[in-house]
Amino acid sequence: MLLNKITFFERFEHDILSGAKTITLRDEAESHVIVGQILPVSTFETERWFCDIQIIDVTPVKLTELTEVHAKQENMTLPQLRDVIAEIYPGLEQLFMIRFRILSQ
């Protein structure tokens, strides 16, 4: 079933709105989006809407395949990115990279 909204931790809001964060790494359950799809974006903590995004690409990627390029697209260093993934998805190897662009704020 396609997602009809997407949430991010509040700590990522500024990076998304500034354009510094252009991808999100999700597990399979949160990977059900299609190229061109438009989604409202809210904070995970309070479900407060803060922008809409359009999906540009969805690509499977393994945790061990993450590079500095992925980290830069997340506006983090590679060690920071791996730590965040381990915190959110402990023990998960298969991820999905969802590339997006902001449509409105």
UniProtKB/Swiss-Prot annotation:
Reactions catalysed according to its record: N(4)-acetylcytidine + H2O = cytidine + acetate + H(+); N(4)-acetyl-2'-deoxycytidine + H2O = 2'-deoxycytidine + acetate + H(+); N(4)-acetylcytosine + H2O = cytosine + acetate + H(+)
InterPro entries: AC4CH, ASCH_domain, PUA-like_sf
Enzyme Commission (EC) number: 3.5.1.135
Matching SUPFAM superfamilies: PUA domain-like
Gene Ontology cellular-component annotations: cytosol
Lineage top rank: taxon: Bacteria
Keyword terms, alphabetized: Hydrolase
Sample GO molecular function, one term: hydrolase activity, acting on carbon-nitrogen (but not peptide) bonds, in linear amidines
Catalytic residues, chain numbering: K21, T24, E74
EC supergroup of this enzyme: hydrolase
Residues of the ASCH domain: 7-93
Function: Catalyzes the hydrolysis of N(4)-acetylcytidine (ac4C).
Similarity comment: Belongs to the N(4)-acetylcytidine amidohydrolase family.
The name this protein goes by in its record: N(4)-acetylcytidine amidohydrolase
Origin organism lineage: Bacteria, Pseudomonadati, Pseudomonadota, Gammaproteobacteria, Alteromonadales
